[in-house]
Each structure stands twice: as structure tokens, then as C-alpha cells.
Amino acid sequence: MFAAALLSAATASAQCTGDGVQLYPAPGGIVPTNMRLLLEGVGTAKSPVLGLVGKPLKLVSTDHEVKLKVTKGWESTLGRATVILKLAEPMQPDKRYFLNLQEVLPNVSLLNGQVGAQPSWLSGKGPDAKAPKWVKRPAVSEGFVRRSPQGIARFVKLNLALREESPAFLVVKLSPRRLGLSPQQYLLPVQGNTAYLGHEACGGAFALEDGRSYRARIEAFDAAGNLAPSTPPVDFEAPSAQGP
């Protein structure tokens, strides 16, 4: 369906992320007062993150606290897991809220935040109650393969567009077209109208086998958890690492 391309070492989607956690929406941004936080554990941080389910967490500003309920989200077979942090009440507008991760995950690195600083977000003017709308439904545009000393990274690039002001995310249920194999389901952040489905050489979100046919059922939502309308599944073949 598409040609596989060898990625350069500088290609971000093929790099090994390393052990630690990632927060979505990414720390530092402006978020709706009813945002829903996603906390991903990568590598050795996967189990500690899953261990937070049911434990009390909170967002703290100078004069307001919001309790967070931690529920299980999605788990990858390649060393990743994401939990959902739901706000017990909305944040107050125009305030900076902090999450003390070191209190519950000591000595765990934050991979998408400022080094040495508590992750924080600035609350916006109000809640986000409007669901995202599709401008361009997801489609696979190309496949990428990169060989390195650690192994093979393999991705497909999803092109899409949503009418949505806050950060958007996909939950993909990926099923091999061959019967008898279990589906995979995991989270993908949308970055600049694209999302990368696949795996790095040392782990990742989805295991793609060389040249295998897949069907991806895609669900999109925004930072507040509002769901976009359903969209047809996407069929594709995983890129092959075999040269011509």
C-alpha cells in the first residue's frame, strides 16, 4: 500500500523514549478547567504507574486543591501503560495547578516536562464541553522502518485533522487481519495533525510485524475526554524491513 522508508537517527518517532513517565496534556500549557490528565509509564515506570490506580492524588494551586481519581486506562505489550486522572471538581479559571509526582513516584523521571520542576498547567477561562469534529478522517500515508544496534523501529504515519482547540488523542484498537491473534489497544497523542502508530527498537505503543495486514479502529477525544464522532476503520500493511 505504501513504500517503507529508512528513518535517519534524528527522527523523533523512532528514538527510544527511555524509562520514566509522560503526562498528557503536556505540562506547561493552557488547559480547560475540566481537563482529564493521562499519565503514561514507560519501561521500568510502567508498574509503578499502574500501582497508582485507586490511590489519592491532587492538583494544587495557591489557594485551591482538586482531588484526582486514578483509574486504569490502557496497557501496551511493549512496556507501556497509561492511567487516567479524573478531576473530582473543575479547576478554578486562570490559576496554575501543580502535580507533585515525586510524592507518589519518587525518583521517576518526567520525560516531557521541565527537568527538576513540578509539572503544572494553567487553567483556562472555563470547561470544554464541545466534542471534536473530524475535518479529515484518519488515513495511513506512509510507513517507516529504521535499523539500529538496539533493533528495528517500525511505524506508520496517520494523517488526520480535528476541529478542536485543546490537545487531542487517539485510542486505537489494532487487530491483525489473520484470525487467531489478539488485538492491541493503546493511546496515541495527536501532534500537528499526525499520529505515529508502531514501536521503537526498544519498546513502544504497538507491536507491528513485518509486512502484516492490520485493521485499526480509531477513537478520538480531547483534553476533557469529549469524544469525536465515530470513524470507519483504517486498513494497512506494516512496513517491511526487507530491502529490495
Annotated model-derived regions:
Residues 33-55, 80-108, 156-158, 210-222:
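Extracytoplasmic/surface-exposed domains of secreted proteins
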Residues 13-58, 114-166, 217, 238-244:
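N-terminal non-catalytic regions of secreted/periplasmic and cell-surface proteins
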Residues 62-78:
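Solvent-exposed beta-strand/loop surfaces of large extracellular or lumenal domains
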Residues 227-229:
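A structural signal for beta-strand boundary/capping segments at domain termini and interdomain linkers
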Residues 72-74, 87-89, 204-206:
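Beta-strand-rich interaction surfaces with strong enrichment in secreted/lumenal proteins
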Residues 46-67, 159-187:
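Extended low-complexity, serine/threonine- and proline-enriched intrinsically disordered segments
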